[in-house]
């Protein structure tokens, strides 16, 4: 909400309350990409734990997961609200390591955002970048460990990795 207000003010865009509310509602009502539910189910069948680490608020995250029909597929949902620091600050990624009680090298951080992937990689997490648009890798000083076109190949990629 604050980011939307800041961006519209900075760009000198007049935005009505109705348009603002409609834009914010878009974050609460999302549809997953077609392969996401089945991929999450396969990962669960492999005994994998799935978690979300987001700059979003707990309310936004739970509403979005519910609208997407994905809430039951995530065992852990972490919001930066708990530490009042945003990604890509290292404290955020440490929060995930602590909450999951798993060493960084045994996690896989998956993101479609280059800056988010770079922050996680700089922290020391293995990273898969989901590059649905075939965009060039951003020049952020670190690169993802693997680049995926979508999530459908993730279970096969992980079969050789320990749980």
Task: Place the predicted regions along the sequence by residue.
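Transmembrane alpha-helical core positions of polytopic small-molecule transporters
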Residues: 29-30, 86
């Amino acid at each position: 909400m604050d980011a939307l207000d800041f961006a519209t003010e900075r760009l000198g865009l007049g935005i009505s309350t109705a348009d603002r509310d409609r834009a914010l509602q878009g974050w609460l009502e999302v549809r997953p990409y077609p392969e996401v539910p089945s991929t999450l189910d396969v990962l669960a069948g492999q005994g994998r734990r799935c978690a979300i680490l987001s700059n979003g608020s707990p309310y936004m995250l739970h509403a979005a997961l519910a609208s997407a029909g994905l809430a039951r597929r995530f065992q852990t949902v972490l919001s930066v609200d708990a530490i009042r620091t945003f990604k890509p600050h290292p404290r955020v990624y440490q929060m995930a390591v602590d909450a999951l009680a798993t060493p960084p090298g045994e996690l896989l951080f998956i993101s479609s955002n280059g800056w988010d992937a770079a922050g996680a990689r700089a922290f020391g997490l293995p990273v898969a970048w989901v590059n649905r648009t075939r965009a060039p890798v951003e020049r952020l000083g670190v690169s993802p460990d693997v680049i995926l076109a979508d999530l459908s190949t993730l279970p096969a990629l992980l079969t050789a990795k320990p749980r």
